[in-house]
From Swiss-Prot:
Its cofactor is FAD. This is tRNA uridine 5-carboxymethylaminomethyl modification enzyme MnmG. It is found in: Cytoplasm. The keyword tRNA processing applies. InterPro entries: FAD/NAD-bd_sf (IPR036188), GIDA_C_N (IPR049312), MnmG (IPR004416), MnmG-rel (IPR002218), MnmG-rel_CS (IPR020595), MnmG_C (IPR026904), MnmG_C_subdom (IPR047001), MnmG_C_subdom_sf (IPR044920). It comes from Lactococcus lactis subsp. cremoris (strain SK11). GO terms for molecular function: flavin adenine dinucleotide binding.
């Protein structure tokens, strides 16, 4: 085969999955090519101008802990930072940043361009080149006929695969934001034999900032207290001059406009064929599914410091443009707003994810990986997490090293990938805290403690990041030791001080850690009694200490559950397993096992339609092998 150039890894698509995949592979020493349809759309945000949020924010922290880029990049380019769910327990707290979308993309493009071992090139890949047996990928062919050789290929094409934009009765071939649609590659994947699904997502109108009457909306400022996505970011760099978002609502008039035009809605007229996201429905879907609600929240989100475009979060729609004009003007604060871009729906092809291994390598073609919305997920963060895993595994495969699989107990990224490859998805998949059975372990504050050592082992965590992490953990250990040794004694002055703070008296001496276990007590109050540490304790260390001590009992119970699950995960299933030999299992279980081909007993136990009796039979069979 005649190749123009040869690479270790070729990544197709420069979105959020593609940049993480290519950076990971290159940083691990693989000669990498990132091919993208448009160099001006690297890490572009075609929908909401934000990073993080519930569950998603924890994923960004996990990406950072493993040595990925998304957290570092948003810390350089945000216009607002906010910790969500602060009134709830630590398991559901998550960080969200409003991004300067142009700065975010430009900064990430610079990072990619400057990365050693990584070549960024504009071009459209139309075909995968396979070996003579049609079992292994060996390169790609572009629309210009140029052929590039590769030992591994990662497809991260987002919503571009046979993408079609829909606005009212208008439907035309396009990727996101009127970029080119990738039709040749979509056809090629179908020809190779992949099962292809058709999904849909959408985006709301954008309006001119200067045409908004903010007096009719509620200001939503960022946090004054510093927070960051990257564990390497400094509190000294926390942005003081933040830009607020604004809250408004739909009205009864908004709903009337929508109801009167539902017959023109592509979602209901049959124009939209793809399956849409359950957890991010269009406004026309909302007023139909939740007809009893008098109004729906809308967030006016600035798209950056140097643009007048404002994103109307919560108003995703593919209604005809004339309906969108009327709809926007029915919203308080937007009566005189000038619409800059209409909302639209986009349909696209997906590789149904049950065809993937937990490494995100396809079962059908060796060396071929897929990640991001190509796999049926929604969201920049979910895409980036998958891209990182695919990039790591592509590099490891080439190096002949053990594969990288995150467990459900180790990361939300692990939960997501296990859900995708074990259960599959029939709609755009979104990460939720409720999907994680070990969410008290998978917290925002301990992502580095969970994953930095793993990232170091695979060769992605830099020396600087590793030293920073080790210093933090050493301080954590020293302060935990001090809190478990220094005591509050039931002396008169201690009792008086406790009373002034609103705490009851103590009968026996308590260690600082025992006092901190009380739900109403915080670290600063413990220090009032046992004194300051001989060093300045980092804010993030204090946060970790408070959670680990306060919830120690619950965390221990969760870890006991993890140990039980790990025993199931340790039982491997042979790759060439003959499922027909299991005579006693239910027919549905046999069919599911054949389709998913689980790799461990633990994975088999999580397949929908498989009951405990089937797992017991499988366990007995494996133990007899």
């Amino acid at each position: 085969m005649n190749f123009q150039e040869n690479y270790d890894v070729i990544v197709i698509g420069g979105g959020h999955a593609g940049v993480e995949a290519s950076l990971a592979a290159a940083r691990m020493g693989s000669k990498t090519l990132l091919m993208t349809i448009n160099l001006n759309m690297v890490a572009f945000m075609p929908c909401n101008p934000s990073i993080g949020g519930s569950a998603k924010g924890i994923v960004v922290r996990e990406i950072d802990a493993l040595g990925g880029e998304m957290g570092r990049n948003i810390d350089k380019t945000y216009i607002q930072m906010k910790m969500l769910n602060t009134g709830k327990g630590p398991a559901v707290r998550a960080l969200r940043a409003q991004a300067d979308k142009d700065e975010y993309a430009a900064s990430m493009k610079n990072t990619v361009s400057d990365q050693e071992n990584l070549t960024l090139r504009q071009g459209m890949v139309e075909e995968l080149i396979l070996d003579d047996e049609k079992q292994k990928v060996i390169g790609v062919r572009t629309s210009t006929g140029t052929q590039y050789g590769a030992k591994a290929v990662i497809i991260t094409t987002g919503t571009a695969l046979r993408g079609e934009i829909i606005i009212g009765e208008l439907k035309y071939s396009s990727g996101p934001n009127n970029s080119l649609s990738s039709i040749g590659l979509a056809d090629n994947l179908h020809e190779i034999g992949f099962e292809i699904g058709r999904f849909k997502t959408g985006t709301p109108p954008r309006v001119l900032a200067s045409s908004i009457d903010y007096d009719k909306t509620e200001i939503q400022p960022g946090d004054e207290a510093p927070n960051h996505f990257s564990f390497m970011s400094s509190d000294e760099d926390y942005l003081k001059d933040q830009i607020p978002c604004w809250l408004t609502y739909t009205t009864e008039n908004s709903h009337t406009i929508l109801r009167d035009n539902l017959h023109r809605a592509p979602l209901f007229s049959g124009i939209v064929k793809g399956v849409g996201p359950r957890y991010c429905p269009s406004i026309e879907d909302k007023i139909t599914r939740f007809a009893d609600k008098p109004r729906h929240q809308l967030f006016l989100e600035p798209e950056g410091r140097n643009t007048e475009e404002v994103y109307i979060g919560g108003l995703s729609t593919s209604m005809p443009e004339d309906v969108q004009f009327d709809l926007v003007k029915s919203i308080p604060g937007l009566e005189n707003a000038k619409m800059m871009r209409p909302g639209y729906a986009i349909e696209y092809d997906v590789v149904m994810p049950h065809q993937l291994r937990p490494t995100l390598e396809t079962k059908l073609i060796s060396g071929l990986f897929t990640a991001g919305q190509t796999n049926g997920t929604s969201g920049y963060e979910e895409a980036a997490g998958q891209g990182l895993v695919a990039g790591i595994n592509a590099a490891l495969k080439i190096q002949g090293k053990p594969e990288f699989i995150l467990k459900r107990s180790e990361a939300y990224i692990g939960v997501m990938i296990d859900d995708l490859v074990t259960k599959g998805t029939l709609e755009p998949y979104r990460l939720l805290t409720s999907r994680a059975e070990y969410r008290l372990i998978l917290r925002h504050d301990n992502a580095d403690r969970r994953l930095t050592e793993i990232g170091r082992q695979v060769g992605l965590v830099s020396d600087a990041q590793w030293e920073h992490y080790q210093a933090k953990m050493a301080q954590f250990d020293r302060e935990m030791k001090r809190l478990n040794s220094e005591k509050l004694k039931p002396l008169p002055d201690t009792q008086e001080k406790l009373g002034k703070l609103g705490f009851g008296p103590i009968k026996d001496a308590l260690t600082g850690a025992e006092f901190l276990k009380r739900p109403e007590v915080h670290y600063d109050e413990v220090i009032d009694f046992i004194g300051q540490a001989p060093e300045v304790i980092d804010r993030t260390v204090i946060e970790l200490i408070e959670t680990e001590i306060t919830y120690e009992g619950y965390i221990k119970k969760a870890m006991d559950q993890v140990d039980k699950m790990h025993r199931l995960e340790a039982k491997r299933i042979p790759k060439n397993m003959d499922w027909d030999k299991l005579d006693s299992i239910a027919t549905e279980a046999r069919q599911k096992f054949k389709k998913i081909n689980p790799e461990t007993l633990g994975q088999a136990s999580r397949i929908s339609g498989v009951n405990p009796a089937d797992i017991s039979i499988l366990m007995v069979y494996l133990e007899g092998k």
